[in-house]
Design a protein with these regions (language model features):
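Extracellular beta-strand-rich solenoid/capping regions of secreted or surface-exposed proteins
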Residues: 86-93, 104-118, 127-144, 150-164, ...
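Acidic glycine-/aspartate-rich tracts in secreted/extracellular proteins
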Residues: 78, 102-104, 124-125
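Extracellular "leader-to-stem" segments immediately downstream of a signal peptide or signal-anchor
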Residues: 1-96, 106
């Protein structure tokens, strides 16, 4: 006669496996998530474009950039003015910035990027030269698929992140030949990812900076 074995699952079916933890919720921008009729604005026209946000990794993986903002198209390679990258980056509202032109933008001063911006260079070859990008006390910025090279002047970096900036993602960018450094992250800035980017180091004051 067979043995009887007692156990927690002998008289009833085993409990279902535990549910996986919910993914972290992206923090909303100050203006809210901008929904109309239960759907996110622009969802039907640029869903694949904005899917970039879901591929972020590392400490900056919660960066949402301009996810909940309008699509803004750069149509000019001028340093400033209508249709320029600088005009888009200084806007107060969240924006997902794309390019309708390829070429070189000669920056005569640092290009300051405000919070909740995505600079998305995919599909074009966009080169920034002369100066670099400055992220000062800003939050939720994504920079993707840009070339930054040939920055000249004292304290000129390809990308400066300071002070107290958070949730920044720099992805698939090429940086080379800046008089100071390529990417400078300082002064309590945190939650930042630099991924899949090419950095060509150049000497500065007997040291190398990346």
């Amino acid at each position: 006669m067979g043995s009887r074995v007692s156990g927690p699952y002998m008289d009833s079916p085993p409990p279902p496996p535990p549910r996986p933890p919910s993914p972290p919720r992206h923090p909303p921008h100050p203006q809210g998530e901008r929904h109309v009729g239960g759907e996110m604005l622009y969802q039907d026209t640029d869903h694949r474009l904005r899917a970039l946000v879901g591929s972020a990794e590392g400490f900056g993986r919660h960066a949402i950039g301009g996810l909940y903002g309008a699509i803004h198209r750069v149509t000019s390679l001028q340093d400033d003015g209508p249709g320029s990258l600088r005009e888009a980056c200084r806007a107060e509202e969240p924006l997902w910035i794309v390019f309708e032109v390829s070429g070189t933008i000669h920056l005569h001063s640092y290009l300051r990027v405000s919070s909740y911006k995505t600079i998305d260079g995919r599909g074009q070859r966009v080169v920034l030269t002369g100066k670099g990008l400055r992220l000062k006390s800003c939050h939720h910025v994504i920079i993707c698929n840009l070339v930054l090279e040939g920055g000249r002047g004292h304290d000129v970096d390809g990308i400066q992140v300071k002070p107290d900036s958070t949730n920044i993602w720099i992805d698939r960018c090429t940086l080379a030949d800046y008089d100071d450094g390529l990417i400078d992250i300082t002064r309590q800035s945190t939650d930042i990812t630099v991924s899949r980017s090419f950095h060509s180091s150049f000497p500065c004051k007997s040291y190398y900076y990346i």
